Amino acid sequence: MDTPSRYWLTILSSRINS
């Protein structure tokens, strides 16, 4: 299974960008 690190990073970035 792929690492959710990338997904988390994207979500975090989105939250910070917002």
Swiss-Prot record:
Stimuli inducing this protein: Expressed at high levels equally in exponential and stationary phase in rich medium (at protein level).
InterPro entries referenced in this protein's UniProt entry, alphabetically: YsgD-like
Name assigned to this protein: Protein YsgD
Organism: Escherichia coli (strain K12)
